[in-house]
Design a protein with these regions (language model features):
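Surface-exposed amphipathic alpha-helices with a cationic face
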Residues: 17, 230-238
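Acidic/polar, compositionally biased interaction segments
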Residues: 31-198, 214-216, 221-228
Length: 336
């Protein structure tokens, strides 16, 4: 499999703001992060300059140098030309500029051994000890390791990452995230904003942290407080459009709550522009749904068959896979 970072990526908010003369306001609504996203722009205020060494300890001759735009290092074999397939270490240096003042949570997932310094102070030292197993790195990574740190908005500080492949197998590396600890009522902020707006667009869904290869989805339901967000915004504004951005079917028992629902899937780098085309009435969303969405989870054959026994799932519906299951059992789906 492969992942590609697009050359151009415009968010729906940016596209809507740039293409209309309307007053566009924004509220986060809720937090759906399964794990903390990697540090990147705008918090990452300079590229991560990484020196690789062909040893488990940092030092000596530099085997290779590389620049990264986000704190997400995952390697099958050699990270780059000149570096050993398995025995290596690296030192990465960059600067970060927090967007808000207050407590932040630094999070690490690793397959190997990692030490992180911020402003020349060791914040996480995960070079010794058992940190448990997580789902990331195809099940070879640790559970998230966390620490708190106070940071000031706009104050640029150095961050240094030290990593060793010692003790890791097959997939090596680390992912480092940093996010402010929210003390705001995000749902209330969204509800209040919707109440004083002419119309509301609520974008819900998942991301590659929830839907990815290498493991099953955790749940059939939208993560976080997204259903409550839909309900509260729809109650506050009768002209609410809910945009569902997921890679597969999710619970939609709330489908009659908003004024309109648009399912867009993971549409790629032109998602923002395409969505605005539809919202402004310039294009007709005339596509077909690739999957059937059950009216309730209990109507899905997965409810009966998953997770199975001894890591084996039996497809008990037999030939009635997909829409045939609902047709054969006269089950009216939420979305055909």
């Amino acid at each position: 499999s492969a992942g590609v970072r697009p050359y151009r990526n415009v968010s729906p908010l940016s596209a809507l703001t740039e293409r209309t003369n309307l007053e566009i306001t924004y509220a986060q609504g809720c937090d759906i992060d399964r794990t903390t996203p990697p540090i990147e722009t705008p918090i990452l205020s300079s590229p991560i300059e990484v020196d690789f060494f062909n040893a488990h300890s940092i030092g000596g001759e530099i085997a290779a140098h590389k620049t990264y735009s986000r704190a997400d290092f995952k390697f099958f074999g050699s990270p780059t030309k000149g570096v050993d397939n398995h025995t290596y270490s690296f030192s990465g240096k960059a600067t970060i500029t927090p967007e808000v003042t207050g407590k932040h949570e630094l999070r690490l997932v690793q397959s190997g051994k990692t030490r992180i310094r911020i402003n020349n102070e060791v914040i996480i030292d995960a070079t010794e000890g058992d940190f448990g197993k997580g789902d990331d790195f195809f099940g070879m990574g640790s559970a998230e390791i966390t620490a708190e740190i106070d940071l000031e908005a706009g104050n640029e500080v150095p961050i240094e990452i030290e990593f060793s492949s010692e003790g890791a197998i097959l997939m090596l590396g680390c992912r480092i995230g940093l996010k402010p600890i929210m003390e705001r009522d995000l749902l209330q902020e969204a509800e209040d904003l919707a109440a004083k707006s002419d119309a509301a667009v609520v974008i819900v869904g998942t991301n590659d942290d929830w839907e990815t290869e290498g493991r099953d989805r955790d749940s059939f339901f939208l993560p976080g407080d997204q259903v409550e967000l839909i309900e509260r915004v729809s109650a506050a504004n009768s002209k609410t459009i809910v945009v569902v951005n997921t890679g597969g079917p999710h619970d939609m028992t709330w489908i009659d709550t908003p004024n309109a629902v648009l399912n867009i899937g993971f549409a790629g780098q032109e998602l923002g522009e395409a969505l605005v085309d539809i919202l402004l009435g310039e294009k007709d969303p005339s596509g077909r749904m690739p999957t059937t969405v059950p009216a309730r989870y209990e109507h899905s054959p997965a409810y009966l068959n998953y997770p199975g026994e001894n890591s084996v799932v039996r497809y008990g519906e037999g030939l009635y896979i997909g829409y045939r299951w609902f047709t054969a059992r006269h089950l009216e789906p939420a979305v055909p």
